[in-house]
Amino acid sequence: MSNGTAVMGKINNKKTHITCRRCGHHTYNVRTKRCSHCGFPAPRIRSYKWAKAK
């Protein structure tokens, strides 16, 4: 018997995010090919009203 899935240990040693070309933040997801900060490669920059300071 083992605790949990053995495959999950193989996922941990890879990079999930790298530096984004557009915004420069370390938020570009390598697997989904999308930046969680600016939304690259979408043509419009990602911005939400709830994310801005009041």
From Swiss-Prot:
UniProt entry tagged with the keyword Ribonucleoprotein: yes
GO biological process terms on file: translation
Keywords, comma-separated and alphabetical: Metal-binding, Ribonucleoprotein, Ribosomal protein, RNA-binding, rRNA-binding, Zinc, Zinc-finger
Signal peptide: none
Cofactor remark from the record: Binds 1 zinc ion per subunit.
Required cofactor(s): Zn(2+)
Binding site for Zn(2+): C20, C23, C35, C38
Pfam family for this entry, one: Ribosomal_L37e
Zn-finger region bounds: C4-type: 20-38
Entry GO MF terms: rRNA binding; structural constituent of ribosome; zinc ion binding
GO CC annotations, alphabetized: cytosolic large ribosomal subunit
Entries under NCBIfam families matching the protein: PRK04179.1 (NF003214)
HAMAP family in UniProt: Ribosomal_eL37
Family affiliation: Belongs to the eukaryotic ribosomal protein eL37 family.
Function: Binds to the 23S rRNA.
Protein name according to UniProt: Large ribosomal subunit protein eL37
